[in-house]
Regions:
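Active-/binding-site microenvironments in catalytic and ligand-binding cores
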Residues: 1-181
Length: 181
């Protein structure tokens, strides 16, 4: 669903301009908390601010073919930097397909070894330049369920321009709007 912009006040009638923005919680770049999948788990507004800031590392996965997998080797190739990061951001190069049918297609996803490594670590979040962590045809949301079942972690989707972040650790923040539930 496309965002809607509705003028609620204007200069001529009210002396100022104000716009109502109507969007779903999955519009553009967004964050999934555990409550996205599990009732009673942490919502974005219940997580502490420090959940949304820390050291990030971009994992270059642009060589993976459509329908392929992000493997443990993609992560461990970064050595100590991968373990020192609070956020692992996966650059699949998929943001270039935004607005096309390809974007909604067979984007690469984490394999079991890679997600297990993430779950065994102390990461605050993971992020991707694709629309989800599950394959497009996985209606069961298997990876979402595995990620959020026993871990307080966030999943950031539809990131853009990860290639501009460099190859080292950098300060990253992804503070959401503080809206209840």
């Amino acid at each position: 669903e496309q965002p809607q912009l509705i003028t609620v006040n204007n200069y001529d009638e009210n002396g100022f301009r104000e716009t109502l923005l109507k969007i779903t919680t999955h519009t553009g770049t967004h964050i999934d908390p555990p409550a996205h999948i599990y009732n009673g788990k942490a919502t974005l507004d219940s997580l502490p601010p420090e959940q949304f800031i820390g050291k990030a590392l971009v994992i270059d996965c642009r060589s993976i073919k459509p329908g392929g997998h992000i493997t443990l080797q993609h992560i461990t190739a970064y050595g100590a930097k991968a373990k020192a990061a609070d956020f692992l951001l996966f650059n699949l190069g998929w943001d270039k397909y935004w607005g096309t049918e390809t974007y909604l297609g067979q984007y690469p996803c984490l394999n079991d070894e890679a997600i297990n490594f993430i779950l065994e670590g102390s990461y605050k979040g993971i992020g991707f330049d694709v629309m989800g962590i599950d394959p497009i045809d996985d209606e069961n949301l298997t990876l979402h369920k595995k990620l959020f079942k026993n871990k307080q972690i966030v999943n950031i989707e539809n990131l853009k321009n990860l290639d501009l972040c460099g190859s080292g650790l950098f300060l990253f923040s992804c503070f959401p709007l503080k809206i209840a539930n």
